[in-house]
């Protein structure tokens, strides 16, 4: 049996569903709401987290039912991955798709999310709950430098 991790052996298309799911580092970026300018299609990043996101752990409170509970919940698939060009350069799906290695803090490499939180990769230090926000425009952040 090979000691080489699956993400170094397989393309995204070759991964099982379990392998695909395990690539997600749980940073929470997908769970922050984005606003889209209707005239220009420009994406505005906010720090407003979906109410299903547990901000402290950066995990979905209702992962199995997320699409029922949140109609705008994002589902990354092999087929639509390239349409999410706002994903951060740290995103494992993006990294593997570009033939790059995972970072040392990624839970598959480090064994836990502690290193991610320590490096401030997760959104827990910036996120606010959607249900607590009155005016989303007050929560627009500058477009991250990594956004294409």
Curated annotation (Swiss-Prot):
Signal peptide: none
InterPro entries per record: Puta_zinc/iron-chelating_dom, UCP006173
Sequence similarity: Belongs to the UPF0260 family.
Matches recorded under HAMAP family: UPF0260 (MF_00676)
Protein name: UPF0260 protein Spro_2751
Taxonomic source organism: Serratia proteamaculans (strain 568)
